Curated annotation (Swiss-Prot):
Transmembrane segments: none annotated. Its cofactor is Mn(2+); Mg(2+). It comes from Lacticaseibacillus casei (strain BL23) (Lactobacillus casei). CDD domains: RNase_HII_bacteria_HII_like. This is Ribonuclease HII. NCBIfam families: PRK00015.1-1, PRK00015.1-3. PANTHER family: RIBONUCLEASE H2 SUBUNIT A, RIBONUCLEASE HII.
Length: 252
């Protein structure tokens, strides 16, 4: 009879023989029952993730019948008082299997785990940035459009079609706009993760350059700590002067 440690090693394999599972089921040891239960939970979780991934790739699978290269686009940072809007365009391979989802539904740790896998396995990734001066000059919506067009232009493989989270990208390509696209498309979800990780890291860098605003935690959003910093220290070069609280501080 295998030891529990041997069973544990066998259950960690990519494929587990039915005879192993049958033997575990017949094993009267409490530890054997726990190992089997844990394995079954992992299998159920994996099956659920596969179903969810298939659901979130339904738009890609529809388009892949016509287009080889479909890019998903998303933005991060339209609402903050400071920092840029960051956009990403991602073309995924048809066999992509990582459980990407709306970046807002993931923890920072989960995003940081998925981020390198997206960069490594994607066919192409493009980044666009609209800084606070562009946002103040163009308005936030148009600045985001420009950053999305920039992200498409930075793809090393030209996309044939775009999936976009509820916006129009000013480029001459077929595009489908999806409401809550980052929760309904793996390509948009991957783009949201890439954009979020890049912007968060940028704001953490700005926190060191401009201490006193808590950028490392609020990422430029108008939190109590950020507003207190704005009142105490004034407006930094990365603040959006067209946004109400910043504009009010400039007038005070």
């Amino acid at each position: 009879m295998p030891t529990l440690s041997e069973y544990k090693a066998l259950l960690a394999a990519d494929e587990v023989a039915p005879t192993i599972l049958a033997a575990l089921k017949e094993d009267s040891r409490i530890g054997a029952g726990k190992l089997l239960a844990a394995y079954q939970r992992r299998q159920a979780h994996q099956a659920a993730e596969e179903v969810a991934l298939r659901y979130r790739s339904r738009y890609e699978r529809q388009l892949w019948g016509t287009y080889e290269y479909v890019a998903g686009l998303d933005e991060v940072g339209r609402g903050p008082l400071a920092g840029p809007v960051v956009t990403a365009a991602v073309i995924l391979p048809h066999h992509f299997q990582w459980p990407v989802n709306d970046s807002k539904q993931l923890t920072a740790h989960e995003r940081n785990v998925l981020y390198p896998h997206i960069l490594t396995e994607a066919i192409a990734v493009g980044i666009g940035v609209a800084d606070n001066r562009t946002i103040d000059r163009e308005n936030i919506y148009h600045a985001t459009e420009l950053a999305m067009a920039q992200a498409v232009d930075h793809l090393r493989v030209a996309p044939e079609c775009l999936l976009v989270d509820a916006m129009h990208v000013p480029v001459d390509l077929p595009q489908k706009r999806l409401i809550k696209g980052d929760a309904n498309s793996i390509s948009i979800a991957a783009a949201s993760i890439v954009a979020k990780v890049i912007r968060d890291r940028l704001m953490m860098m700005y926190d060191k350059i401009y201490p006193g605003y808590d950028f490392k935690d609020n990422m430029g959003y108008g939190t109590k700590a950020h507003l207190a910093g704005l009142a105490a220290h004034g407006v930094t070069p990365i603040h959006r002067r067209s946004f109400g609280p910043v504009r009010d501080r400039l007038r005070s």
